[in-house]
C-alpha cells in the first residue's frame, strides 16, 4: 500500500510504501468506539463528590410538629426530600471508572483508525518535521503553507525545538508513536506521520 508524501506546501510530491497491516485494515466501528470510550474512562480522575444526608450540615431539630400542620411528617431538613438535603445515592470520589481493553483489541482498534483515516484522505506522510529554532511562528507558517488548521503530528522523535514550537498552537498536537492515542486520532482533521515513525507504528499496531 502507498500513501501520499507531502512537500512543505502540502502537495503530494510522491508516494511512500506503508504496511497494509496498519494502514489498510478493515473498518471496525464497534471496536473503535470501545477503545475510545475506554481510553476516556481510564483518563477520568474521579474527583466528583456529593453529600448524603449524614454529611450535609443541617440541624437535627424536627422542622415542625408531627401532627396538626397538614404537612407530610418530617424528621430533619437533611432529608433527601428537602431542598438542600443530602443525595440518596451520592457520587463518590472513590468510584472506579476504569475499563479493561486487552492489547490485541487495542492494537487492532488503533490500526483500524489509522486505516480509515488513510481511506478518507485525512492521513498523509511527511519526510520529517525538523525545526532549526523553537519559534511558534515558524511552525505555524509551515502548517499555514500546507493549509492545515487542525493537525496531529506523529513524529519518530519530538525534539525540544519541535515541542516548544508546537505547545502553544491551538488545534495542533505533536507526539511520538508510543504516545499516540485513539481520541486524538479521531479528533484532529488531519494526521501527519513522518517517514521515520511508520516503522514504529508497524511495530506497535501490526
Swiss-Prot record:
Subunit structure: Part of the 50S ribosomal subunit.
Keywords of the record: Ribonucleoprotein, Ribosomal protein, RNA-binding, rRNA-binding
Family of this protein: Belongs to the universal ribosomal protein uL4 family.
Pfam family, one: Ribosomal_L4
Keyword Hydrolase listed: no
PANTHER family: 50S RIBOSOMAL PROTEIN L4, LARGE RIBOSOMAL SUBUNIT PROTEIN UL4M
GO cellular component: ribonucleoprotein complex; ribosome
Matches recorded under InterPro entries: Ribosomal_uL4 (IPR002136), Ribosomal_uL4-like (IPR013005), Ribosomal_uL4_dom_sf (IPR023574)
Gene3D superfamilies: 3.40.1370.10
Segments forming a coiled coil: none
The protein's name: Large ribosomal subunit protein uL4
Recorded GO MF terms: rRNA binding; structural constituent of ribosome
Gene: rplD
Source organism (scientific name): Acidovorax ebreus (strain TPSY)
Role noted for this protein: One of the primary rRNA binding proteins, this protein initially binds near the 5'-end of the 23S rRNA. It is important during the early stages of 50S assembly. It makes multiple contacts with different domains of the 23S rRNA in the assembled 50S subunit and ribosome.
Superkingdom of the source species: Bacteria
Region listing for Disordered, in residue ranges: 46-77
GO BP: any one term: translation
Amino acid at each position: 500500500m502507498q500513501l501520499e508524501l507531502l512537500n512543505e506546501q502540502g502537495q503530494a510530491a510522491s508516494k511512500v510504501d506503508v504496511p497494509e497491516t496498519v494502514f489498510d485494515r478493515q473498518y471496525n466501528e464497534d471496536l473503535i468506539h470501545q477503545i475510545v470510550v475506554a481510553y476516556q474512562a481510564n483518563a477520568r480522575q474521579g474527583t466528583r463528590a456529593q453529600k448524603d444526608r449524614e454529611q450535609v450540615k443541617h440541624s437535627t431539630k424536627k422542622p415542625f410538629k408531627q401532627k396538626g400542620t397538614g404537612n407530610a411528617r418530617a424528621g430533619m431538613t437533611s432529608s433527601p426530600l428537602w431542598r438542600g438535603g443530602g443525595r440518596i445515592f451520592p457520587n463518590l470520589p472513590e468510584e472506579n471508572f476504569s475499563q479493561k481493553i486487552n492489547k490485541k483489541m487495542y492494537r487492532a482498534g488503533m490500526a483500524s483508525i489509522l486505516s480509515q483515516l488513510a481511506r478518507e484522505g485525512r492521513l498523509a506522510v511527511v519526510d520529517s518535521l525538523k525545526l532549526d529554532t523553537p519559534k511558534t511562528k515558524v511552525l505555524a507558517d509551515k502548517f499555514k503553507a500546507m493549509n492545515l488548521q487542525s493537525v496531529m503530528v506523529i513524529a519518530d522523535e519530538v525534539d525540544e525545538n519541535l515541542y516548544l514550537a508546537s505547545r502553544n498552537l491551538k488545534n495542533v498536537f505533536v507526539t511520538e508513536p508510543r504516545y499516540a492515542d485513539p481520541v486524538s486520532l479521531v479528533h484532529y482533521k488531519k494526521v501527519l506521520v513522518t517517514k521515520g515513525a511508520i516503522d514504529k507504528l508497524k511495530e506497535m499496531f501490526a
